[in-house]
Amino acid sequence: MHIERHEIGPRFSEMTVVDVGTGKLVFIAGQVAENTSLDIGGQTREVLGFIDRLLQHVGARREHIVSARVYLASVGDYAQMNAVWDDWVVQGHTPARVTVGAKLINSAYKVEIEATAAFTPKDGHDHAHDDNCEKPHASGDLR
């Protein structure tokens, strides 16, 4: 078994990839919006874009997500967040998901999403060893 960590900080990594033989498990840390002036729909879109970019870096796609955890600063934003989620998620490949109301670390954050994906690399290239993974966002500089 081999473990790769990406965008390593003193407290956490943005993403961890575990090679489990013929496949990989991808653990994405909680992602938050960079542009905190956006409404819940905008912040959700931005966060899901960060997740897409991290998955893409290792050769995975959103349909490989097997589990997601959504944290909302206001449970009143549930319907609006779901509208964006429903447009983004791949039908027929919806992951197990939990959504909870939570006091987020920065009061300007409206949503935080973490995800776990599982996939088998198809192209023979191990993207997890690429060194050009750009940091998708600031993540509150709390790593």
Role assignments for model-derived ranges:
Residues 1-66, 72-143:
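N-terminal presequence-like segments and the immediate start of the first folded domain
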